[in-house]
């Protein structure tokens, strides 16, 4: 299994417009972050996790001008714009009348259908993406024969989902994990987890909180994602982390 970090930034991305802090003015491209998303390849099948407003540019960075394969499915973690704002750009994957399957909880599916209703109408305008919504619950399901295990997370007071595929778990935007969900996170080779910044935040984990989760879950390796410009410079933060914890960056590919 291969995972590519398409984006590792928070809702505003890095750099922020109008900001002159050391991160936003950094010349290190690892400090430049699109909105958080990931592309997973399993046995030649592609699964996208979240589809934010930077999706088109992320695809250009990933595939350049090379042909790309079909998407087996898109897993949605929650309804916030930085995670679903690029769904219309899935139209490139819908040529030749191909359907892209979306997977989301009922309340998330409803929110998406309200925001882009033209995508789900029976008689679509020519050229709009051909998306099919699949409502899921907090129970395992399959995407093109690949087992997906949802993980209940709390984004402040908002219930959202993380996902486990094989021995990799992708947990973004969480503040807490319900105690009963930890059994789903045993035996991980790789944990991907949000670490917004050092300072306390009401709906996202801080760096220290993410490190505490890593200690509790005990993956072989862990990667931080969904980082703001106040997270700090990539290289400086990496030096302060345990040897099995890494600051992810856009374009990083890992193998599990």
Question: What residues fall within each predicted segment?
Answer:
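Binuclear metal-dependent hydrolase catalytic cores
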Residues: 1-171, 236-256
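Active-site-proximal loop/helix segments of hydrolase catalytic cores
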Residues: 154-161, 165-194
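Binuclear metal-ion centers of metallo-dependent hydrolases, dominated by the metallo-beta-lactamase
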Residues: 178-256
């Amino acid at each position: 299994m291969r995972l590519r970090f398409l984006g590792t930034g928070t809702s505003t991305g890095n750099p922020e417009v109008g900001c002159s802090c050391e991160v936003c003015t950094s010349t290190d491209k690892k400090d430049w972050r699109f909105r958080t998303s990931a592309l997973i390849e399993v046995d030649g099948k592609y699964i996208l996790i979240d589809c934010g407003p930077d999706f088109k540019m992320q695809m250009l960075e990933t595939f350049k001008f090379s042909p790309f394969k079909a998407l087996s499915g898109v897993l949605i973690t929650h309804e916030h714009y930085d995670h679903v704002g690029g769904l219309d750009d899935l139209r490139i994957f819908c040529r030749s009348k191909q359907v892209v399957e979306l997977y989301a909880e009922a309340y998330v599916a409803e929110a998406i259908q309200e925001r882009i209703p033209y995508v789900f109408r029976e008689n679509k305008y020519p050229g709009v993406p051909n998306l099919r919504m699949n409502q899921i619950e907090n129970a395992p399901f399959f995407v093109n024969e690949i087992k997906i295990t949802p993980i209940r997370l709390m984004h402040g007071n908002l219930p959202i989902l993380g996902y486990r595929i094989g021995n990799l778990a992708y947990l973004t935007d969480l503040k807490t994990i319900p105690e009963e969900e930890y059994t789903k996170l045993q035996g991980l080779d790789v944990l991907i987890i949000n670490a917004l910044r050092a300072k306390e935040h009401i709906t996202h984990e801080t760096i220290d909180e993410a490190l505490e989760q890593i200690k509790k879950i005990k993956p072989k390796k862990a990667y931080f994602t969904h980082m703001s410009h106040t997270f700090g410079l990539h290289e400086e933060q990496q030096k302060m982390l345990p040897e099995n914890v890494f600051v992810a960056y856009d374009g990083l590919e890992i193998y599990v």
